[in-house]
């Protein structure tokens, strides 16, 4: 039996029944990483010794018949912008090359408390800016379904690790679609929770009013399991909400009778691949057959979401990334005349092109002459988009759409076409702007590549997402798909 192909809940059952040891599971994944990651590029750092040490500790507890915790013995990969004490945290950027984190992010603490085994740090677009993981300063990540194609981004490594059987679960971050789009491209399940449901403490900031940590897994049950562990109030993050986290396992039922689902016409317009449209429409029929009430709806302001997103996120990035100055830590230019020169050269040499592009855009829209015309206007548009979603959720429990207008595109195909790259997030960005939760799960294949179905719900209604996603997933076989790599 190939342990790397199993889900987290299957491995949990085997550990509980003493059919396998945690060390055996961990070594199977480490062997897999050593075998395939030179081609897949999911990991930027592997913590082999520490992972085996933790696994042995869990095996001792199992031998003593101690009760297992939620993630005991489950191998997990962490995106390289989420702090793990003693491991690198580079954000896939030259400017943080060699930086080792002195503390754990809140989500990392929660995983460690539940005895998850952290295998290492995962590849990403630099500072989470990108949709293909081609912006990593260190190496390319490849899609396990086709090595000539991208895995999506910015959490490309997180999706590749799960799809390529290099981790059972992974954590990514989602600012404008960075968990959902790679989940779609790689055929795994990925959740962007409600803004405030999961702590951002210890996560390197890109867009502070948009960033959210999101789990990825092989199926909906795995995704719900990891969400249950990391969700909840954190006093170190004032944006988290003191709201009880439901038992998401209770939502994992096929019964969705009476659930009202809206189909927004704006998500099915020009630019959507006809085969993806067909796959999503077939998925909607399955939900309807399972008892959901499906009706059309409209979100007329969605056309403005992408523009508002890039103004707001770039403005926040410009502010957040000002802290990387070549003085206290990270990359410092070797040739400089004075302090001003250190800042200029360290940042110019340390940041990649896409990061510099967004810093420049953000600085521009925050400048005195353009603040009202761009940034302030974008915030007003954001409020209207939120109102749009609230209006729809008065009549519907959820909205269904494609996750991405295309399947995974080829490496290099959009790297130099900025607008085309940005448009690959056209169905995920509105959800981020509004701050509502959404999940992506596989709903078909087009030319050998996975297609993602996006289900969106109202604030803090992740339980509704898991219910609908599980109902659909268990009615089809797409969740059993594994990349033959």
UniProtKB/Swiss-Prot annotation:
Entry-linked SUPFAM superfamilies: Amidase signature (AS) enzymes
Name of a matching Pfam family: Amidase
EC number: 6.3.5.7
Positions annotated as active site in the UniProt record: 79 (charge relay system), 154 (charge relay system), 178 (acyl-ester intermediate)
Gene3D superfamilies: Amidase signature (AS) domain (3.90.1300.10)
A molecular function (GO) term: ATP binding
Reactions catalysed according to its record: L-glutamyl-tRNA(Gln) + L-glutamine + ATP + H2O = L-glutaminyl-tRNA(Gln) + L-glutamate + ADP + phosphate + H(+)
Signal peptide: none
Entry GO terms, CC: glutamyl-tRNA(Gln) amidotransferase complex
Any one GO biological process: translation
Domain of life: Bacteria
InterPro entries the record matches: Amidase, Amidase_CS, Amidase_dom, AS_sf, GatA
Keyword tags: ATP-binding, Ligase, Nucleotide-binding, Protein biosynthesis
Function according to Swiss-Prot or TrEMBL: Allows the formation of correctly charged Gln-tRNA(Gln) through the transamidation of misacylated Glu-tRNA(Gln) in organisms which lack glutaminyl-tRNA synthetase. The reaction takes place in the presence of glutamine and ATP through an activated gamma-phospho-Glu-tRNA(Gln).
Quaternary data: Heterotrimer of A, B and C subunits.
Family stated for the protein in its record: Belongs to the amidase family. GatA subfamily.
HAMAP family assigned to the protein according to its UniProt record, in alphabetical order: GatA
Stored NCBIfam families: gatA
The protein's name: Glutamyl-tRNA(Gln) amidotransferase subunit A
Gene: gatA
């Amino acid at each position: 039996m190939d342990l790397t192909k199993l889900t987290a809940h299957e491995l949990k059952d085997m550990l509980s029944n003493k059919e396998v040891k945690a060390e055996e599971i961990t070594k199977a994944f480490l062997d897999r990483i050593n075998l395939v990651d030179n081609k897949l590029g999911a990991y930027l750092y592997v913590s082999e010794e520490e992972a085996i040490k933790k696994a042995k500790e869990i095996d001792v507890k199992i031998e003593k018949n101690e009760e297992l915790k939620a993630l005991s013995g489950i191998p997990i990969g962490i995106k390289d912008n989420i702090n793990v004490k003693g491991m690198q945290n580079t954000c896939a950027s030259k400017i943080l090359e060699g930086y080792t984190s002195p503390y754990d992010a809140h989500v990392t603490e929660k995983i460690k408390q539940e005895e998850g085994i952290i295998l290492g740090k995962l590849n990403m677009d630099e500072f989470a800016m990108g949709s293909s993981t081609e912006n990593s300063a260190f190496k390319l990540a490849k899609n396990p379904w086709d090595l000539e194609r991208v895995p999506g981004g910015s959490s490309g490594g997180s999706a590749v690790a799960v799809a390529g059987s290099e981790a059972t679960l992974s954590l990514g971050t989602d600012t404008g679609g960075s968990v959902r789009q790679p989940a779609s491209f790689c055929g795994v399940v990925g959740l962007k929770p409600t803004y405030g449901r999961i702590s951002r403490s210890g996560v390197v900031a890109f867009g502070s009013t948009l960033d959210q940590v999101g789990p990825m897994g092989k199926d909906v049950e795995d995704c719900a399991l990891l969400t249950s562990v990391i969700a909840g109030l954190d006093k170190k993050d004032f944006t988290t909400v003191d709201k009880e986290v439901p038992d998401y396992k209770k939502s994992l039922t096929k019964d969705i009778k009476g659930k009202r689902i809206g189909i927004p016409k704006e998500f099915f317009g020009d630019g959507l691949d006809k085969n993806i449209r067909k796959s999503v429409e077939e998925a909607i029929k399955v939900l309807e057959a399972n008892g959901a009430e499906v009706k059309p709806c409209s979100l007329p302001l969605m056309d403005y979401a992408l523009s508002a997103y890039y103004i707001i996120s770039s403005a926040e990035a410009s502010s957040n990334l000002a802290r990387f100055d070549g003085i206290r830590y990270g990359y410092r230019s070797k040739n400089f005349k004075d302090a001003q020169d250190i800042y200029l050269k360290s940042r110019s040499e340390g940041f990649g092109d896409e990061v510099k592009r967004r810093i420049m855009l953000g600085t521009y829209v925050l400048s005195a002459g353009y603040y009202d015309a761009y940034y302030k206007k974008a915030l007003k548009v954001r409020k209207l988009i939120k109102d749009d979603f609230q209006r729809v959720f008065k009549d519907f429990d959820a909205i269904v759409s494609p996750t991405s207008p295309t399947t995974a595109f080829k490496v290099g195909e959009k790297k130099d076409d900025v607008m085309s790259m940005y448009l690959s997030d056209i169905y995920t960005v509105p959800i981020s702007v509004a701050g509502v939760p959404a999940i992506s799960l596989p709903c078909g294949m087009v030319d050998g590549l996975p297609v993602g179905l996006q289900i969106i719900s109202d604030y803090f209604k992740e339980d509704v997402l898991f219910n609908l996603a599980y109902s659909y997933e268990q009615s089809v076989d797409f969740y059993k798909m594994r990349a033959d790599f």
